[in-house]
Amino acid sequence: MRYRFGYVSNAVTLWEASPAKSLTFARYSKLSKEEGKEALLRTTKANLVNTLRTLYFAISHDIPLYRFSSSIVPLATHPEVRWDFVTPFQKEFLEIGDLVKRHGLRVSFHPNQFTLFTSPKPSITENAVIDMTYHYQMLEAMKLEKEGYMNIHVGGAYGDKDSALQRFDENIKQLPAHIKARMTLENDDKTYTSLETLGVCEKHGIPFVFDYHHHVANKDDNAALEDILPRMFDTWTSTGIPPKIHLSSPKSEKAIRSHADGVDMSFVLPLFHALKPCGRDVDFMIEAKLKDQALLRLVEELSAIRGNKRVGGGTIEWKP
């Protein structure tokens, strides 16, 4: 079994390398038209440059997974701004995509928690479609629309989960099929459990991203890992790639939903024990605060387990 690991957005080891530099609408609205355009271009350019820096860092450390920042392009979905961010940066987007393909990286996006399809408000669904389209446009500009995925949560319950899930069934129809085909769903830490999210994934043919930390914080009484994991694998069968699992650990016993700086191996070991009988490859996205540093430390700790072998900076051959 081969387990690969990746991190989110930026490498904390790198100096001043955030790919999510912001330009608020409040600031933008105070600028002249030309100044506003220049600010959009300048901020996006900086974020694309730092995305490249972060990718080179991952490659140099042999880390095979990476999640792009959703904030690469400022104000891309703001109703009063929405601008053509692809044309001025065709070269930069293609350079990123070429680098990803050349080194065989697995990449993804994670639109924010407001991108959901369970709301009773049509405007929320419209905004979700706009946001998913924005992320797809970036994948398309990188020529990665056949490789990358966009991961979101099911959404809110609004006091009635059954009705909310029925709205999901209807609202998701507004998402163009080619964009929905690049979508995954993840269980969350407060509302939709692993089993509930799996049910939606199986119904709609959407791959299931299992978040172990969320599962611990928001668990069905009868949800055994031994039952969840085989079903998770099944949702990825048609993709031809391993499933993805999110890894993090609680900041403290009281702050169980907050992410710690690193990943506590004792917290995640039950998951690895449950995965062992499956005998399948898995990719893991580290969601700890220290990102790349947390990843490298966890990989080192896991590879020290007798029988395991580290075969790359972010890859372990796990003893069957």
UniProtKB/Swiss-Prot annotation:
| GO MF, one example | endonuclease activity
Give the domain of life: Bacteria
Q: Which InterPro entries match?
A: UvdE, UvdE_bac, Xyl_isomerase-like_sf
Q: Which keywords has UniProt assigned to this entry? A: DNA damage, DNA excision, DNA repair, Endonuclease, Hydrolase, Nuclease
Cite a single GO BP annotation. nucleotide-excision repair
Listed EC numbers = 3.-.-.-
Transmembrane stretches, start-end: none
Coiled coil residues, start to end: none
Report the top EC class in one word.
hydrolase
**Is Signal one of the keywords UniProt gives this record?**
no
The record's function comment reads: Component in a DNA repair pathway. Removal of UV LIGHT damaged nucleotides. Recognizes pyrimidine dimers and cleave a phosphodiester bond immediately 5' to the lesion.
Family, per the entry?
Answer: Belongs to the uve1/UvsE family.
Q: What is the name attached to this protein's record? A: UV DNA damage endonuclease
Q: What is the lineage of its organism?
A: Bacteria, Bacillati, Bacillota, Bacilli, Bacillales
* Gene from which the chain derives: uvsE
